[in-house]
Amino acid sequence: MSATAARFPATDVRLSVEQVSYAYAANPLQAPLFTLEATSFQARPGEIVAILGPNASGKSTLLKLISGALAPLSGRVLLNGFPTHSLDPRARARRIAVVQQESRLLFPARVWEFVLQGRHPYSRGLAFESEEDVLIAKNALAQVGAVALNDRWLDQISGGEKQRVILARALAQQPLLLLLDEPTLHLDIGAQVDLLEALQRLARQNRYTVVVVTHELNLAGGYSDQVVLLHRGKSLRVGPPASVYQRELLEQVFQTALTVEMGGSGRPRVSILSDS
């Protein structure tokens, strides 16, 4: 498939990224430096899209454009037909949940307190959380298998457990679109697999549209429905993992000799070739 994704019927599309570009200038006398050029893809409810590429390929810029934190220089990002950057912060937070690489605590908190922060977009003034908010937060913890962590202090749980709790806070926002920036960073292999399997299950069951930024080839290929392959700010290919994972293309992007094999499930598996 080419760098422009195949189009679905309009009624099926939740997220539409249409020829989006972004650039910045270090100073007014310099020509703009493009960090992302003419990128397009569409995603439906229940789908996982992986934005894949090496460092400085434009992955985080694209995620910020999708979230509405940045306005595109050209093109548009539509969520259910509405430009994401034109939504006010409260409306945006009710529709889009963003899980950053690092979630830092400003003060000590128990897990349940942290997850309840996801209900902030629905709060009214200085009122305390409602019974409904508490139930939604508890359900979010249950969805990620973290109910047993409810009363634990956030700084006293493992990295894998913390990522599940951070995901629960995002789910408590009841979003249509879930955006995650390198969610498996610093996790061991087992925790990575657990997190991606949870995301896949949640996307299917709750009809979330999920966009994950990653540089992990096998995680992207193993769990996503679509891959957007970026290189130096350009979208080189968009499509199902099996169509994107071409050896020559991946070697060009990642500057590494590798092999690509298709497993029994039709999912690609990448191995790095040793120099020896």
Regions found by a protein language model. Give the residues of each.
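Conserved ABC transporter NBD signature motif
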Residues: 75-83, 92
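Conserved ABC ATPase signature
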Residues: 153-157, 161
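The feature captures the beta-strand-to-loop junction immediately N-terminal to the Walker
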Residues: 52-54
